[in-house]
Amino acid sequence: MAEMVARLASERAVVVFTKSGCCMCTAVTTLLGELAVSAAVHELDREPLGKEMERELARRLYGSGGRGGPAVPAVFIGGSLVGGTSKVMTVHLKGELVPMLKSAGALWL
């Protein structure tokens, strides 16, 4: 499963793993959309292996036990895990998100 998540996370400059109906997922994808980023979005509750992928994302976000909070949204930029909602919003408010997106080729501003 780790290889599958890594492959999906690297398919585009920005990849977001979400669940339909998740308000925090909507907040992150809306922010990226407002920045004119075309992210690949994978809704785990609509993926055949979504539960397994969610466990792998939780492991990546919170360590080997995979416990500590929600696994979605999980945002990857340039193939690297940035984090969930709080991390994405923090780097955005610090002015670091746009440079990350530019570096990954997701923005041309």
Curated annotation (Swiss-Prot):
Per the entry, what this protein does is: Has a glutathione-disulfide oxidoreductase activity in the presence of NADPH and glutathione reductase. Reduces low molecular weight disulfides and proteins.
Principal localisation:
cytoplasm
What the entry lists under InterPro entries is as follows: GlrX-like_pln_2, Glutaredoxin, Glutaredoxin_subgr, Thioredoxin-like_sf
**Family of this protein:** Belongs to the glutaredoxin family. CC-type subfamily.
The taxonomic lineage of its organism, from the top, reads: Eukaryota, Viridiplantae, Streptophyta, Embryophyta, Tracheophyta
Q: What UniProt keywords apply to this chain's record, in alphabetical order?
A: Cytoplasm, Disulfide bond, Electron transport, Nucleus, Redox-active center, Transport
- Subcellular locations according to the entry: Cytoplasm; Nucleus
Query: Residues in domain Glutaredoxin?
Result: 2-108
Protein's recorded name: Putative glutaredoxin-C12
Q: Motif Responsive for interaction with TGA factors: list the residue ranges.
A: 106-109
Name any GO cellular component annotation.
cytoplasm
Which pairs are disulfide-linked?
Answer: C22-C25
